[in-house]
């Protein structure tokens, strides 16, 4: 069978129309299939394609194949069969190669020449690595139909046209049917998609983006928008640099994040080296589909093919870009949103597309991403990027131009109409799935109507199919053979590559192990990164403050202004030249208008003038004729001869002149000729060099420009120096004189002219100004109306920028100006809820104070009962009687564990009671100790007095029962003291480093002391002990970085091994590091040190990951580090967040972690068996400590020998940041962590105990009393009152000796509510009043632009201010009424309703509705002056302190609200617990009193029924003798039924005096003598005794007194030896009197 017949029949099966061609192309392609050898042109040179075309055309002419219609040679849409083959399949198939002659292949087979390139291509699809038999079974039948069998063909009507030699090449094709046009359409669609995603304008056009995309800037920005994390983008696009590969690698991270299949990926060289740029756009096209599939908020890709226009140059540029790179099959990447055909193929294709894309996006769908589009981050990034860009106006095409008035062109809005609402129809051709079967070939029968259709070809279809299969098999086997050879030759390289790939995958799995956990915090991480990037960009901003206004700067600016002026003048001149004809016409019209009136008059009188003109013309013509005649009369030949002679002489003279010049310069001419000949010879010899220099033309031009610039500058400087010599002496005076004369003359002339027409000038100026102003207003109005949306948007952007700048200034500035406060003042104008909460909290605090005082009163009464029992015991009344019948609580004595408790007298006990209150205040309120330490200079901290004070203060916080998991009360208050000391030290620091320096702080001593507790050291050893022991035990580890010491170690080793060493010990470090053995050892030590630091960081990072199995960092360390971070932020807001984090890191390493590295012996870690090993281990730990400290400070080393580790330190910055932020300072407030608060002591039933040595107690008391004026705020301070009572209480030396003998005491501290002092309350009230007044003033005088508060206060008051103030007050009053109507009732015990709901409205400003603005301002000034007199404010800084407090209220509004809410919760709980305690104490006190009374009653009235001799024994005392005085006294009482219930006794005064019960007495009128005076002691009620005086049997009137048992015990407690009765007439001895009462009326215990 003939080969030509088979080829002809194969060609006849091709389609003619574009639709069918597109369908075929789509059928043979896979959905979203990248550019490869099956559906896009491979990388052949143009010459080979042309040869293929010529072969097919020659074959067609040999077979007499003619088309039905004549074809034009240059037609693209109606091309030859070769063109059809090339355009429809876009790749030379096996058929084309088989028809090519062997002579044109230059000895290379078509397979080797064409397909070998495809083997090395990186575009091989992923299915190429699968089963090749399945691929062959799925190959299309019409795509690679090849055969060598000849078959007769049907005669065609017309021959097939071949392209002529004059046809345009694809690189010069500018039509819309060219691939370049589609390429530009796809790029434009991707550009619009990028703009919508990035939310920024891309200034480059589609043709410019072909080369601009190589820098990867837009790709990196896209990655930052989509990925959870953001990284800096290299934005320098002046030229392509190698650093742009970082942007491309950033985009690769985005592809890895979405698991982008290899089908759509590209390599770095494809983009950076422009090897295959179209594949990059195809990757973006596929990525848009995946993003839209996953998150519909991302827009879908549009299809702009046929809908946009491009210039011919742009299309040619795109075609040239596609010469060496194939055009991807973008149509397969369309989402199918356009109109679809009704055929079954299209429906199947659509389903196949969806199925394939589902597979593509399935890895992402498995784990739903929490990604959200961070709009705020995008805005911040755009602002940071745009800060460094020049201000350019962008037109619709994206090109930047300088916005300047153009006198020749009108302002025309070139922006194209918005296409946001237009429906873009995607004309996506239908496609078929890539599924073919050889047994049942798919034949498109629609070609039977074609002129190329041959029925005879159908009978040979099985043979054709078999031929195609054989051809494909042969090609495939050859390619597999070549692939196997190549793979065999690169076996070792591939092994290494696969190992690297596997390692990379393993590392990626390790890196992304916590990705899902981090995604939950993506928003916080993004905000943190945005803040960090903001600080980085702020730090990178250039500093223009150092630029001085020197002469060079002024000259440079002058040159720039001159250049701009010349360019503008040239621009105007060129514009005028363009319109020269119009200008000439316009000038002609102007001139015509000027002479029109004159010529019109002349024409009107032409009849009169015409005869005279005709006569004048006749005379003129006659004169001209006569002249011409006289000139013609001269002989021309003679004139010609004369002229020839003259010209000859002139030529000869010119030749002589030139020859003379040549002779005079002969030697120079010879040299010039020699130079020229040498140049020509060198040019011929160095053509290759010059050709290479052509590519360096830019560099040479720069060199020449530099040389010319240097020459010009030398010339300019020389002229300038010459002028400078005479500048002051001659030039400037002359110029000054001339300028003065000219200016004065011009001024006089101008003024004289103006004064002559002064009225007209004024009128003209007024009209002109009015016209200009109206025109400007009309122009602005029209512009705003036309661009209202843009104006609103611009205003919003400006407002946003201004607000951001103001907020930044408010946050970072230590002293924010008034204009910033004015902007944010409205934030405090609506604080109803906050103020109500503040009032509620204040009432709750007052209620807590009241309940605490009530509970203290109950506790005091119970303590008095305790004292009463002690006194009863002293008087031999058994306390066991009180304890037997009750199980109630017994109160412990004031001082415990004291042997000599009975030796403490009343004054000592009173002293101890005061100490209990005093040290409770000192322990629980850290501000007192902070002020005490602040009054002591830092230099005295290490002195003996300073150390004694420190040790005494430490004893106030005895942390004994604490542990890592359990926190005691003392630890809570100790940490609060550390935090307060740190805040005070930070306020006194000058830089960030001062916060962590021992000699400039007080808190470090307490922190270090607490860390030295046994349980703290044990925990740190458990945390790092194994790590340190491993370093110490490893004798091979050496971290030495000093070259001299390394050099000496080598010498010592040689001495030890060889017994001698030839090296000299006198050598410098620079010379030592040059030695190979020292250098190798140095590098090895640093590498080992780096690895050890990395291991330690890994341990801490695992701790940061939240692993509960690991040991945690103690809470107090976290709290102190967090406080250091917050203090650094408040004190130094202008520093970066990294520097703030470094403060916390230094605290953690230097003052906690470093202790086990510096002093391992304190942790029970032995550093070695001998001195050498100990020194080496300590040095290793010391170097490890230095590097860890430098790592956590995030600063490079200044030490020359440790500088090689700076790169490692910078690379570990992100890791250290994460450790600090997640593991160290990630902790709440101290109350939340310790679950304690200041009210806990008030609600507990047991008082807190404090065991302290008496010496420390006395020293602390002395220090506090000496500095009481410093540590307290005023006389109304509770601590001050307590100190005054302590000073008033005087004790004797004997008592002091007794106290010192006790060694130590355990005090039951007296919890007392801490009330605010009157001075502080008054100051706070005045500040609140001033702030409230100032807020009203700022709101009223909003239009005042003054930045000074003092100027605002003293500025004048306008009527508009009064009106504005009244409006504000009325508005607030209306809001107040609404708030009161809607307010809910609150419990009367917790809060009272307030009438005002404005901020600061609880102060005594009075009714604002009755105040005028003048009175308000006056009141504000008076309050400020009061604060100034108190020293709180100063006018030197314009009362900036007041503005700072308002700014603090604005900044901390939210935190204050949270703190207030927490305080409300704590206060409510405290009130509840205090109420429970109050009820408990009430019940206990009542039961205690009732029980004591019942016991005393029982003791006074023993059961008489149980005593058989009760008649003889009365009240359990001795038997009364019969016929005694007592006997008759009792009988008389019983006779008159007056016998008291608990007995009565009668004694004479003389007997009482003898018993020393009665000391002195005197009668009123000497009624009776002492022997006749009797005292009667009776008891009618329990604990009440009546004393009466009688003379004989007659009672003395008025001589009756009642005394209680409590009064007697009080006399004994107060050590009063005597007391008076009967209005001072009788004096008794207290002790003997009490002894008489207890003996007669109570049952005393037996000793």
From Swiss-Prot:
GO terms for biological process: actomyosin contractile ring assembly; mitotic actomyosin contractile ring assembly actin filament organization. The modification Phosphothreonine is found at residues 66, 72, 82, 367. SUPFAM superfamilies: Calponin-homology domain, CH-domain, GTPase activation domain, GAP, RGC domain-like. Keywords: Actin-binding, Cell cycle, Cell division, Coiled coil, Phosphoprotein, Repeat. Residues 841-919 form a coiled coil. Residues 958-1223 form the Ras-GAP domain. The modification Phosphoserine is found at residues 48, 83, 91, 139, 165, 167, 169, 369, 433, 440, 1064, 1068, 1088, 1383, 1385. Induction: Rat catheter biofilm repressed. Its main location: other. The calponin homology (CH) domain binds to actin filaments and is required for their recruitment to the bud neck. The IQ domains provide the interaction surface for the myosin light chain MLC1. This is Ras GTPase-activating-like protein IQG1. It comes from Candida albicans (strain SC5314 / ATCC MYA-2876). The lineage of its organism: Eukaryota, Fungi, Dikarya, Ascomycota, Saccharomycotina.
């Amino acid at each position: 069978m003939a080969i030509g017949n088979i080829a002809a029949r194969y060609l006849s099966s091709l389609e003619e129309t574009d639709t069918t061609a597109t369908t075929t192309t789509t059928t043979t392609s896979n959905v979203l299939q990248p550019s490869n050898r099956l559906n896009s042109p491979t990388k052949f040179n143009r010459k080979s394609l042309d040869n293929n075309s010529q072969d097919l055309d020659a074959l067609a002419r040999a077979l007499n194949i003619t088309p039905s219609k004549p074809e034009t040679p240059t037609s693209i849409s109606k091309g030859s069969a070769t063109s059809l083959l090339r355009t429809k399949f876009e790749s030379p198939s096996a058929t084309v190669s088989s028809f090519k002659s062997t002579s044109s292949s230059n000895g290379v087979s078509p397979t080797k020449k064409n397909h070998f390139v495809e083997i090395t291509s990186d575009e091989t699809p992923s299915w190429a690595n699968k089963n090749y038999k399945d691929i062959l079974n799925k190959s299309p039948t019409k795509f690679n139909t090849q055969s060598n069998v000849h078959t007769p063909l049907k005669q065609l009507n017309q021959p097939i046209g071949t392209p002529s030699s004059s046809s345009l090449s694809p690189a010069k094709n500018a039509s819309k049917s060219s691939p370049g046009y589609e390429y530009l359409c796809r790029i434009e669609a991707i550009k619009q998609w990028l703009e919508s995603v990035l939310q920024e304008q891309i200034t480059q056009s589609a043709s410019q983006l072909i080369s601009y995309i190589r820098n990867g800037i837009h790709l990196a920005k896209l990655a930052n928008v989509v990925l959870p994390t953001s990284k800096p983008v290299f934005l320098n696009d002046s030229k392509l640099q190698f650093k742009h590969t970082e942007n491309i690698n950033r985009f690769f991270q985005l592809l890895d994040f979405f698991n982008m299949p290899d089908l759509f990926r590209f390599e770095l060289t494809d983009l950076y080296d422009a090897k295959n740029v179209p594949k990059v756009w195809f990757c973006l096209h596929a990525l848009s589909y995946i993003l839209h599939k996953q998150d519909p908020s991302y827009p879908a890709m549009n299809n702009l093919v046929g809908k946009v226009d491009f210039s011919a140059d742009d299309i040619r540029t795109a075609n040239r870009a596609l010469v060496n790179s194939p055009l991807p099959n973008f149509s397969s990447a369309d989402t199918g949103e356009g109109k679809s055909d009704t055929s079954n193929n299209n429906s199947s294709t659509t389903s196949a597309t969806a199925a394939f894309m589902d597979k593509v996006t399935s890895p992402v769908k498995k784990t739903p991403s929490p990604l959200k589009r961070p709009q705020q981050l995008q805005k911040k990034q755009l602002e940071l990027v745009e800060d460094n860009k020049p201000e350019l106006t962008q037109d619709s095409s994206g090109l930047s131009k300088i916005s300047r008035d153009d006198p020749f062109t009108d302002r025309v809005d070139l922006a194209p109409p918005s296409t946001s609402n237009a429906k873009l129809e995607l004309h996506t051709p239908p496609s078929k799935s890539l599924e073919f079967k050889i047994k049942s070939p798919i034949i498109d029968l629609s070609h039977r109507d074609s002129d190329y259709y041959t029925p005879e070809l159908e009978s040979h279809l099985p043979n054709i199919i078999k031929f195609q299969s054989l051809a494909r098999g042969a090609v495939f086997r050859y390619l597999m053979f070549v692939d196997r050879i190549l793979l065999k030759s690169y076996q070792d390289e591939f092994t290494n590559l696969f190992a690297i790939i596997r390692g990379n995958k393993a590392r990626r799995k390790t890196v992304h192990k916590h990705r899902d956990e981090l995604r939950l915090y993506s928003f916080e991480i993004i905000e943190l990164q945005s803040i960090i990037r903001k600080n980085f960009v702020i730090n990178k901003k250039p500093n223009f403050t150092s630029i001085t206004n020197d002469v060079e700067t002024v000259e440079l600016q002058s040159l720039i202004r001159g250049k701009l002026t010349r360019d503008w003048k040239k621009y105007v001149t060129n514009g005028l030249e363009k319109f020269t004809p119009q200008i000439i016409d316009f000038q002609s019209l102007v001139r015509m208008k000027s002479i029109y009136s004159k010529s019109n008059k002349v024409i009107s009188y032409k009849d009169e003038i015409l005869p005279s003109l005709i006569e004048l013309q006749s005379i003129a013509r006659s004169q001209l004729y006569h002249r011409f005649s006289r000139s013609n009369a001269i002989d021309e030949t003679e004139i010609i001869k004369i002229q020839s002679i003259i010209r000859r002489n002139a030529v000869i003279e010119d030749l002589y002149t030139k020859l003379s010049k040549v002779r005079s310069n002969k030697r120079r001419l010879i040299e010039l000729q020699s130079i020229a000949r040498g140049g020509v010879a060198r040019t011929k010899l160095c053509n290759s060099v010059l050709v290479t220099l052509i590519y360096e033309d830019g560099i040479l031009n720069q060199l020449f420009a530099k040389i010319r610039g240097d020459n010009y500058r030398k010339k300019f400087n020389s002229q300038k120096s010459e002028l400078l010599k005479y500048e002051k002496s001659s030039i400037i005076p002359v110029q000054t004189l001339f300028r003065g004369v000219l200016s004065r003359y011009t001024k006089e002339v101008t003024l004289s002219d103006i004064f002559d027409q002064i009225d007209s000038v004024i009128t003209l100026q007024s009209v002109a100004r009015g016209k200009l102003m109206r025109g400007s207003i009309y122009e602005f109005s029209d512009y705003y109306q036309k661009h209202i949306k843009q104006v609103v948007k611009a205003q919003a952007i400006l407002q946003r920028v201004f607000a951001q700048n103001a907020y930044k200034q408010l946050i970072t500035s230590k002293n924010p100006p008034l204009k910033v406060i004015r902007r944010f003042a409205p934030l405090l104008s609506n604080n109803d809820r906050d103020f109500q909460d503040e009032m509620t909290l204040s009432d709750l605090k007052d209620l807590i104070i009241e309940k605490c005082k009530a509970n203290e009163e109950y506790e005091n009464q119970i303590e008095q009962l305790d004292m009463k029992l002690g006194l009863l015991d002293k008087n031999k009344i058994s306390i066991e009687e009180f304890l037997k019948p009750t199980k109630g609580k017994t109160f412990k004595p004031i001082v415990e564990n004291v042997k000599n408790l009975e030796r403490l007298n009343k004054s000592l006990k009173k002293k101890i009671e005061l100490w209990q209150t005093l040290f409770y205040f000192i322990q629980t309120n850290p501000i007192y100790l902070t002020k005490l330490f602040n009054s002591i200079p830092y230099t005295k901290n290490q002195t003996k007095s300073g150390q004694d004070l420190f040790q005494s203060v430490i004893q106030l916080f005895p942390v004994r029962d604490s542990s890592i998991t359990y926190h005691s009360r003392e630890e809570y208050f100790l940490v609060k003291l550390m935090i307060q000391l740190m805040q005070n030290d930070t306020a006194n620091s000058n830089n960030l480093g001062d916060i962590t320096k021992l000699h400039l702080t007080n808190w470090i001593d307490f922190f270090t002391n607490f860390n030295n507790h046994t349980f703290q050291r044990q925990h740190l050893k458990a945390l790092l002990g194994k790590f340190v022991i491993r370093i110490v035990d490893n004798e091979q580890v050496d971290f030495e970085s000093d070259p001299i010491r390394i050099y000496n170690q080598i010498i010592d080793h040689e001495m030890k091994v060889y017994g001698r060493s030839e090296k000299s010990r006198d050598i410098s470090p620079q010379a030592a590091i040059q030695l190979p053995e020292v250098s190798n050892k140095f590098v090895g030590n640093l590498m080992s040190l780096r690895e050890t630091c990395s291991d330690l960081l890994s341990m801490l990072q695992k701790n940061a990951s939240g692993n509960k199995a690991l040991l945690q960092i103690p809470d107090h360390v976290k709290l102190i580090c967090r406080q250091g971070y917050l203090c650094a932020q408040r004190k130094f807001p202008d520093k970066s967040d990294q520097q703030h984090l470094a403060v916390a890191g230094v605290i953690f390493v230097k003052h906690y972690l470093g202790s086990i590295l510096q002093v391992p012996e304190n942790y029970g870690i032995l550093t070695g068996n001998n001195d050498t090993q100990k020194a080496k281990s300590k040095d290793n730990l010391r170097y490890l400590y230095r590097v860890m400290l430098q790592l956590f400070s995030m600063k490079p080393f200044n030490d020359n020998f440790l500088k090689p580790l700076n790169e490692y330190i910078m690379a570990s910055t992100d890791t250290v940041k994460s450790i600090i932020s997640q593991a160290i300072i990630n902790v709440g407030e101290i109350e939340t962590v310790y679950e304690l608060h200041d009210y806990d002591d008030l609600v507990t039933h047991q008082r807190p105990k404090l065991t302290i040595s008496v010496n420390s107690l006395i020293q602390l008391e002395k220090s506090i009393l000496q500095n009481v004026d410093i540590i307290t705020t005023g006389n109304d301070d509770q601590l001050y009152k307590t100190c005054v009572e302590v000073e008033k209480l005087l004790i004797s030396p004997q008592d002091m000796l007794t106290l010192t003998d006790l060694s130590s005491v355990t005090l039951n501290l007296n919890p007392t509510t801490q009330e605010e002092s009157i001075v502080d309350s008054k100051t706070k009230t005045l500040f609140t009043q001033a702030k409230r007044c100032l807020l009203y003033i700022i709101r009223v005088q909003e239009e005042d632009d003054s930045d000074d508060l003092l100027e605002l206060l003293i500025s004048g008051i306008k009527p508009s201010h009064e009106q504005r103030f009244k409006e504000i007050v009325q508005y607030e009053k209306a809001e107040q009424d609404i708030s009161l109507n809607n307010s809910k009732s609150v419990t009367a015990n917790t809060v009272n309703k307030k009438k005002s709901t404005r901020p600061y409205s609880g102060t005594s400003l009075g009714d604002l509705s009755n105040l005028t603005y003048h009175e308000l301002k006056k009141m504000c000034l008076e309050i400020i002056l009061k604060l100034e007199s108190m020293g709180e404010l100063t006018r030197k800084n314009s009362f900036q302190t007041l503005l700072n407090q308002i700014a603090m209220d604005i900044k901390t509004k939210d935190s204050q609200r949270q703190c207030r809410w927490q305080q409300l919760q704590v206060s409510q709980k405290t009130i509840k617990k205090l109420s429970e305690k109050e009820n408990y104490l009430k019940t206990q006190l009542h039961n205690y009193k009732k029980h004591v009374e019942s016991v005393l009653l029982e003791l006074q009235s023993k059961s008489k029924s149980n005593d058989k001799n009760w008649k003889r024994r009365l009240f359990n005392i001795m038997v009364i003798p019969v016929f005694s005085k007592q006997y008759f006294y009792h009988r008389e009482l019983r006779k008159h039924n007056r016998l008291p219930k608990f007995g009565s006794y009668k004694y004479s005064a003389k007997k009482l005096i003898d018993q020393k019960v009665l000391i002195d007495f005197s009668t009123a009128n000497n009624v009776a003598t002492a022997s006749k005076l009797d005292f009667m002691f009776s008891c009618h009620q329990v604990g009440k005794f009546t004393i009466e005086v009688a003379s004989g049997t007659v009672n003395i009137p008025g001589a009756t007194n009642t005394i209680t048992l409590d009064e007697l015990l009080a006399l004994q407690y107060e050590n009063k030896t005597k007391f008076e009765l009967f209005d001072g007439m009788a004096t008794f001895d207290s002790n003997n009197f009490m002894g008489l009462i207890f003996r007669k009326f109570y049952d005393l215990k037996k000793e």
